[in-house]
Amino acid sequence: MNRIDKTLEKLKANRKKMLSPYITAGDPYPELTVSLMHQLVKSGADVLELGIPFSDPMAEGPVIQRAMERALAHSIHCDDVLNMVRQFRKTDNETPVILMGYLNPIEQYGYDLFAQQAVEAGVDGTILVDLPPEEADGVSRVWQKHGLYSIYLCSPTTSAERMNFINQHANGYLYYVSLKGVTGSDALKLPELKAQYLQRKAQSKLPLMVGFGIKTPEMAAQVAEFADGVIVGATLINEIIEAYEAKKDPLQASGALLSSMRQAIDNIGSMV
C-alpha cells in the first residue's frame, strides 16, 4: 500500500486531520532541506510536499517564487531533489513525500525515467500544477506503471466535467485551492470557503485538503473544522527565510510554527 493511503487510513482511524507543509527543495540552501523535512515530521507533519524549483512558477506568489529563485541559484534540479528524498528515506520510511512542481523539468527528464527514479528514491506522488486532468492520460499511465500517485488541484471554479476527469486519474487526495490567484494570497473568507469546499467534497471520491492562504494556527484550525486537512506553504517559507536571514535557527522557527498548527488543528479536530 502507498504511504499516502496508509497515512490517510491512520488519520481517519484516529479521527485526525491531515497537516501537510510545503517547502522548496534547496531553499534557503541545499544542505538544510533534509533536516527541515525531519524537523517538520517531528513537529506534526503527516505528509511532506517538496517543491521542485522552476524558473517560471506561474501559480506561486512572491514568497514561493523567491524560494525557487534561491534554490535555482544553488543549481537545484530534479536529480538533486530526488537525492534529498533518498537521504530523508535513510531514517524515515513512513512519512509520505509528494513532489510538487511544473511539467517542464519532468518532461525534460523523461516521464518514464523520472517516475522510475522517483519511486526508487522514495517519492509517493506528484502534484503537477500545470498539467490539466484532461491532458493527463499519458503521464497518468506512466505513473500507474511505477506506482506513483497523481494528486490533482481543484478549486471553487472547477466544473463537474473536470471533476469527473480528476476522479478518473487522481490517487491519494485532492489539493483544494481555496483562493483565486497565487499561493500566499490574502483574504480567506471562511463561510464562503466552507460552502464552496463542501460542493467539491460532494463531487470527490478522495479526501480534500485545503491549501492557499492558510497563514496562522487559528486559521488552520478553523479550516480543519470542516476540511479533511490543511496544506501550509508560503507562511512556513516566510518563517524559514526570516530566521535564516536573521541568523537564527530555521529548524526551530519552522518547527515552532508547525507544532502550533498541529496543536490547534488537533484541538478542534478531536471535537468533530
Curated annotation (Swiss-Prot):
It comes from the Bacteria. It catalyses: (1S,2R)-1-C-(indol-3-yl)glycerol 3-phosphate + L-serine = D-glyceraldehyde 3-phosphate + L-tryptophan + H2O. It comes from Legionella pneumophila (strain Corby). This is Tryptophan synthase alpha chain. Its EC number is 4.2.1.20. Keywords: Amino-acid biosynthesis, Aromatic amino acid biosynthesis, Lyase, Tryptophan biosynthesis. One of its GO terms (molecular function) is tryptophan synthase activity. Tetramer of two alpha and two beta chains. CDD domains: Tryptophan_synthase_alpha (cd04724). PANTHER family: TRYPTOPHAN SYNTHASE ALPHA CHAIN, CHLOROPLASTIC (PTHR43406:SF1), TRYPTOPHAN SYNTHASE, ALPHA CHAIN (PTHR43406). Pathway: Amino-acid biosynthesis; L-tryptophan biosynthesis; L-tryptophan from chorismate: step 5/5. It is an enzyme of class 4 (lyase).
